[in-house]
Amino acid sequence: MLDKLDGALRFQQEALNLRAQRQEILSANIANADTPGFQARDIDFSSQLQKVMEQGRVNGSGMSLSLTAARHIPAQNIQPPDLDLLFRVPDQPSMDGNTVDMDRERTNFADNSLKYQTDLTILGGQIKGMMSVLQQG
């Protein structure tokens, strides 16, 4: 039964994890907008999500989870996926070699934030639906 619950929520969980990682990448781009020679990076979200869904996240050794009681269910190790970072090609190169376009970064940051909130809303709806089914018996 836990496998079915995990399968139902896994897609949204992976999407949220990738969106959070993308937000960190976009934040780093914005923070380094004035750094000479900094190369703006991003990920192809759809291909990364497909990659994560195909391979799963249970491979390798990630953070270890400890049991504090004998009746606890042991969890598998979790490891963040290896992201394929892409370097952004600037529309208009700068003299110092920095490829950060602040308009593009702010737009991508806001778009990613909105999609993150949408994913949270969808996940919350799925959990509420499961809770109502479990409570009704």
Swiss-Prot record:
NCBIfam families: FlgB. This is Flagellar basal body rod protein FlgB. The keyword Transmembrane helix does not apply. One of its GO terms (biological process) is bacterial-type flagellum-dependent cell motility. The gene is flgB. InterPro entries: Flag_bb_rod_N, Flagellar_basal_body_rod_CS, FlgB. It holds the Pfam family Flg_bb_rod. Keywords: Bacterial flagellum. Its main location: other.
